[in-house]
Amino acid sequence: MAAAITDMADLEELSRLSPLPPGSPGSAARGRAEPPEEEEEEEEEEEEAEAEAVAALLLNGGSGGGGGGGGGGVGGGEAETMSEPSPESASQAGEDEDEEEDDEEEEDESSSSGGGEEESSAESLVGSSGGSSSDETRSLSPGAASSSSGDGDGKEGLEEPKGPRGSQGGGGGGSSSSSVVSSGGDEGYGTGGGGSSATSGGRRGSLEMSSDGEPLSRMDSEDSISSTIMDVDSTISSGRSTPAMMNGQGSTTSSSKNIAYNCCWDQCQACFNSSPDLADHIRSIHVDGQRGGVFVCLWKGCKVYNTPSTSQSWLQRHMLTHSGDKPFKCVVGGCNASFASQGGLARHVPTHFSQQNSSKVSSQPKAKEESPSKAGMNKRRKLKNKRRRSLPRPHDFFDAQTLDAIRHRAICFNLSAHIESLGKGHSVVFHSTVIAKRKEDSGKIKLLLHWMPEDILPDVWVNESERHQLKTKVVHLSKLPKDTALLLDPNIYRTMPQKRLKRTLIRKVFNLYLSKQ
């Protein structure tokens, strides 16, 4: 412990006495105002007291730093043998200590308790003796490694960190890096792996020595972390979507934007936040306000702009296309569709049930394909025929016009054959006219009668005395000659289907058999 404090004092004296090359970073720091001698002495006394306290903690706790497999760290709190620092590295360390002292003065002025929280470079030297390499600048061979840490190694096993931790790093075996002159901070620490190097920093920036001896200045990782946290907070408050907010889900709900619904009616500048409000405004102000029986749409850009109409309901339905309101919602559960007109809703609702029927029909062929047996094929054929019979006829040609045509033909047929008026519905009444007359050798007079309707009965010669009886002749429909009866009407002797004819014959034979018994 005494050797470490002596080395620290020698390091400070060398840093004050050694000249700095022009243009080096230390020259700018040396140009700053140095603190008074009394304050320096007080700070040195505080540093020595803190160093002794840390050494006592290290010796009592027995915490040792992890030394590398080919590195320069030793365990158990043993002091590491240090080589004599070069003038350039000593001057650089002195400059670093001057900067630390200036920063300590500023923190003492801002907070009375700041001096107790900060730790000097002597503490880092003593802490490094418990398991870290020296804070002196040394050049290492490619096969060797050194591990450096802040004052946090001595306190890690005793108390929890109070402030933000510095960067903790561990390198692989056989790596080489330059040691760090740490300015000290709140609980900054670094742990060295097997032959690895680790750097630590506190709240203030640390100086890292490169291989060529020039200091490399970098910002604390805590500052960058805090700035990142502030960016995330501002992003969350503004409602923007960031990858940090997504949490692996791929998307987040962004803040809803207010969409303005403007009324484009002539000489109307109203603006609304929703389409239902705009629709109510149009209906109450512009549609219901029109009087006189003539209704026009004065929406700017409308294809029927200023076109008069006598239907107010048409104008109300038409204005729904301008307002974008869809008040007619689907009544089927789970469907969120809405429509601007009731007709659109009426066309939409049956699609739900047609989809269900189609899904059932589509599931049936799958079941059929699974069992393509002969019995299944016969069953399918029967179902197909049954379905075909049960289906109604798509076309019905017996309409009113066809009925009028049949009635007209029946009237004409009755006028010629008198079936309904004189034949009692089953006989045809023929009327005769004399078309010829002759006198035979015996002196008798013969008359040639022609029957009406024509071409059904043949002409016949009768005696003149029989003329009065044969003016009319009634013939049953079944007695008419079949070759000429079709001329009377084609439906009288209509051909019967073969199956129906067989059925009729079987019934007649059965009735005849029953009558004989």
UniProtKB/Swiss-Prot annotation:
Q: Where is the composition biased (Polar residues)?
A: 352-365
User: A GO CC term?
Assistant: chromatin
Q: What is its main location?
A: nucleus
* Record region (Interaction with RBBP4): 209-294
Q: Where in the cell is it found?
A: Nucleus
* Zinc finger map (C2H2-type): 261-286, 300-322, 328-352
Enumerate the Gene Ontology biological process terms.
chromatin organization; negative regulation of transcription by RNA polymerase II; regulation of transcription by RNA polymerase II
Keyword Glycoprotein applies: no
Keywords (alphabetical) are:
Acetylation, Chromatin regulator, DNA-binding, Metal-binding, Nucleus, Phosphoprotein, Repeat, Repressor, Transcription, Transcription regulation, Zinc, Zinc-finger
Positions of post-translational Phosphoserine modification: S18, S24, S141, S206, S210, S211, S390
GO MF annotation terms: DNA binding; transcription coregulator activity; zinc ion binding
Gly residues compositional bias, start-end: 61-78, 166-175, 185-196
UniProt lists compositionally biased (Basic and acidic residues) regions at: 152-163
| N-acetylalanine: residues carrying this PTM | A2
* Described function: Acts as an accessory subunit for the core Polycomb repressive complex 2 (PRC2), which mediates histone H3K27 (H3K27me3) trimethylation on chromatin leading to transcriptional repression of the affected target gene. Plays a role in nucleosome localization of the PRC2 complex.
How is the quaternary structure described? Self-associates. Associates with the PRC2 complex, which consists of the core components EED, EZH1 or EZH2, SUZ12, and RBBP4, and various combinations of accessory subunits including AEBP2, JARID2, PHF19, MTF2 and EPOP. Found in a monomeric PRC2.2 (class 2) complex consisting of at least SUZ12, RBBP4, AEBP2 and JARID2. Within the PRC2 complex, interacts directly with SUZ12; competes with PHF19 for SUZ12 binding. Interacts with EED, EZH2, and RBBP4. May also interact with RBBP7.
What name does this protein carry? Zinc finger protein AEBP2
Q: Native species of this protein?
A: Homo sapiens
